[in-house]
Amino acid sequence: MDEQSSGQDVDQSLDTLLKEIDLKMQLRDGEEGRRASAQSEGSLRLPAVRMLERGMVASASHKSVTFDEEPPSVHEYSVVMDSSAGTSECAEEEREGADGYECAADTMRVLYDEDTDSSCMGSERALAGPAAEGIVPEGYKEADLLGTERAGSGTPSLSYDDAAGLGSPPHVIFTIKPTSPLNAYDRGSWEPLQSNTAMDTPPRGGTAVSQHGLFAKAPKLPAIPSPNSRRRVSYAGSDSYPSDDSATDKRSLTDKTVPDNRGENERGGFGYENSDRNPSIETGTTDEYQSAGEYKSMSSSEANDDSKTEASVEDLRISNKPQRDTTIQDLHATTLPRSSSTLIPPALPPLDPSFFGRLARSPSYSPIRDRGSSEGSVGEHDSSLEQDHELGMGQQSARTNSSASGNSSDSVMVKPLSLFSNSQVDSLHLGAPAPDNSTPNKEALPSACPPDAMKSIGTQTSILEDKAESGPSQSSATSEKSVMLPNFPRFESFFDDSYPFGHDSDRSNNSVSYSKRTLKPSNYLSIWHLQEAQMRHDSPAFSANSQFSCKMVGESKRTSLESSRLSAKYESRFKFKFKPKLVSRRRIYYNKDQWRNFQEPPTRYYSNCTESDHISSDVPGTPVSPSIKSRNLCHGRTRGNMKMVERVNSLCSANERLSSAGNGDETFLSASSNLDVTSRRPSVDIISEISTKDLLPKIKQDSDGFNELIKTFVDHDEQSQQTDSTIASYRRGTRDTTIYHIWEHSIQENSISDYGNSPTAGKGTISKLLDNHEVEFDGKNSFVTGLGIIKKTDQDSRVDVLRIDSTQGIEAIQSFSPYSYRNAFDPVTPTKSAYHGCEALQASQMGTPFRPAISTTLQAQSGLGHKRPAVERPTTAQLGNYVSAEMSPEVQEPAEETKKRTDLQDNGQLYFVFVGIEQLALRDIERHSAECSIEFDNGNNVVQSEWLPLPKSGSMSLNQEYSVIIAEESLPNMIITLKCRYKSPKKELVEITEKVPLKSKCCGLGKPKYKQVKKLLRREMDFDEWDYKIAQDGSFARCKEQIDEELLKNVRYKKQQFRWTLLSEWERDHSKEHKRKRAWELPRLPAHPAGALVVDMCYLPRTSRFEKFPKTLQIARRVVNKFKEQKAIAMEGFMWQEGGDTEVLKRRYFTLNGTQLVAHHEITKKPKAMINLLRVEKLLTEAEISREMLSSSSRCFTDLVLLHECFVLFFENGEEIMFNPDTKTEKLEWIEKLRKVIELNRFHQPWVKKFLNSSENIL
């Protein structure tokens, strides 16, 4: 009894507190409604309070701003008060009956006040005991853990100490993450917290907030969020459910005024714009035609139970944007601009009687439409109206006739085009009522018709049919002939119900098929019925453009409890699959015959006629222009078009008078006589005839001045209107040959023509446009000789680079030569036909010898999802991932190219290896400290090697490698120059002979005798012999070699050594007769041999635009060695295979030979298929495979369980083949071999195999 009495006291005190809160909130709401416009920009807290009769007492969502950071961070949180004690039971039942929706009870914890009476805490010692003793219970630890994990979602968590600070209420529930509103009326005022911040970051981009400091920001008034799902609350020992029809909710809904985003106050409109909604990236459709499968709930990914598989109604993302109803100004704005193109002032449709009643929005009926629907184009067909008409819900037609006034001359009959048959639409004319529908209908619109139908009805009056063959108008109210407007285009059906059994058109850009991965059929049906039940009562979240919604008026309202029970019942009854539908944009199909003149832009004609000539003459058959005074509501653009028509009419009359006089241009008059009187537009033949004239007017002295003026204006106008005319003819699918006489292709270079393939502009066409003006190159910039220092790859030595493409793998300086412009006139966007024979090199960029092909018989048996075009005799250039082993050998081998390729950027590369220099004609090399270098000139670029010491013998090794690109225009002329630098000795050794007297034996008697003695003496050098042999720039000898076709044929795919003679061309004659002259004045000797140069050459021709060549032959040797290593990899054994040519799991015998993995029959060992490992991108084991990497058609969890020792090969085209060896040892061995093959795939180029097979190649 004590516990019950204490509980009743607590309930009474709680009720008293709630009444005070209710009174304060109502007063505060009234003040906020009056200051709504002033606080729309700077409000820092927007509390929204909801009062329920039972269960949860009050709720509020609060926002606070922290100005300590830059920029200030916004924090949003909520506090919930509840008097029930069965929170754990509520959370358990919500997990079972919430149908997949996020339940707020998962994140709720009940906190107890430490000051509560001990008798009241006796029965609840299991929960409150630890809190009273200062021990944090496990529930609160879990709550803190949840708060830490969900910090990235933008929702703070509350600790146990913060909750203990409340004190006043006995039971307080804090929501870790606020959810959507409980009932339909709370949807608009609640915005769920969504953030993409990382863990431990505050919501909305703010700073981190501690758990103890967070509760200090909570407001004094507690509040609760309204969950979207059904909530059970235990209050005073009895189970009750909040009702949507609660009097408190309706009263708070009616009395509250919420400012919308346009700054207008609407009573009862609680639709807020969803800023997180984005257009569908997968389908490319507009916002108003999004379906449920295109969105995924943010909260559904956080759930770990069975409720994750169920989709929430909020996942449909039905727009809650506040929209204004259609007004008179909207009708004027949408009708007048659209009708201006018809040159006839439109007649405003009469307003529907119920239109003024719909201007005032009521709380019970508030259809919220998407922004895209209100801004749609005029005459856009409403899918919901068509659906209601097909279901028989909108059988009544909306017809309104304008009331006849005294001064009115036109009568308009308005009817939606979707409710008419073809014969009825053909009989409708502007200004003439229908014969059977002249009686006005007092019932303006069916109740089941959406409000968007009024917009469609009001704007479709300007697009009724206008036939050129129709007779004069039957209107008796006016004597003028009214021009009829063309037919409204036919729309494509929104749903393709015949898919996949009907015609499968191309919808790759704007459609998507919803499969089981995006939306399960069972959930699809449950969401369908749940929405149908929720839309039966008036809800502000109703969307007229939703494909699942069906507006039902006149039926009784149902509560959210009944809706959830109904969805559960339908979900349990119907478990069958549905046929997927294609949701896409609707296409408009135009009638080319009727819209030919309507889409053609009017050709403007001008003349020097006076104002009197603008008035139509009384010629029989001349069209009568409408009076401007009778069209006061016409737009300014329409008036201008009417004046232009009057000028055209006056021009026609003037030409007829000139034709009768016999002094006019016959070509122009014949074109002017073809004017269409009914449509008041010139026929298409006029454009083709006028376009044959010269672009500039020609002055003729013997012609009439008026005709010359006419032709001048016509020719000038044609230049300005040629683009518009070509675009119009392009849209109709008919091209005029006289207009497209220059470029001969469609307007947009990158577009695809709807009516056939058009050739692109080639070099001949562009040359014709340039009027034979060729590009001239300045001789000063043709050859640039710049000196730079680079380093070799193998030695740290200096190389002087002048003009060469590359040396030792390093790019050199390029010059502004004519070869730089050899591709100047290539098309900007290459087409498939521009490169003949290279279609197979798009994906892997590999040559023909290494691309296996798929057999047509294998494709028919395998039943693969992708289809390839069948060829009569496939070559290896058209191969896929695997081929049949039964193919003929001639298919496997590539065909030799017999004709010369003309679509390549060059003809390949020629490699030079300077082996060394032999037998130099230089003496005394050691005393001169000589060094030499090689200068290599290919005619465009020059490169010089580093300086190397010249040995005493006169022979040295160089080992220098160079590459030259062989262009298509001409073959290079090679010039190799040997340069030397030395130090002239200051003194020289001279041998002299001296006479040394001998002693006489005869004491001075006789003749004295002498002997000659040779001696070496050092003396100053008079001249140095090297000064007369070496030029001042160091040039000593050179050789010239012309590269011809015969030489390239001898070194094709093989290396061959040559010995070139070096000729001395700079040595001067220093004989005695020229001894007195200076060195530079001496004559030069004839060229004579001074040494020999040993060169190795190799030529690699180009066979593909995507072929890559190595920089040097040394790199080419390493590539060939890697290719040989890959070719030598071999292995065989049994494995299980799934994918490729078999869709089921099969055990086969596999043999690996290089890049070919051949599958044999398990018993007979007969070859079944060959898998091309060149197309493999990666190999992954079971530890590396995740569910995202596997395709939708393959199994995920089952493969990992049953085939735990498997590995998967992923190909370039997205195909996957799974293999499972018998043992783990074999699996590791297969993985090692296959990964080695995949790594060596990068060394595959078309030249590698031919370079390897060359018998004379030295590796």
Swiss-Prot record:
Entry keyword Cell cycle: yes
Domain of life: Eukaryota
Annotated ranges, domain PH: 1128-1239
InterPro entries: Bud4, PH-like_dom_sf, PH_domain
Cellular localisation: Cell septum
Location, primary (coarse class): other
Basic and acidic residues bias: start-end ranges: 247-267, 305-324, 368-391
GO molecular function, one term: GTP binding
Entry GO terms, CC: cell septum; cellular bud neck contractile ring
Protein name (Swiss-Prot/TrEMBL): Bud site selection protein 4 homolog
Species: Eremothecium gossypii (strain ATCC 10895 / CBS 109.51 / FGSC 9923 / NRRL Y-1056) (Yeast)
Phylogenetic lineage: Eukaryota, Fungi, Dikarya, Ascomycota, Saccharomycotina
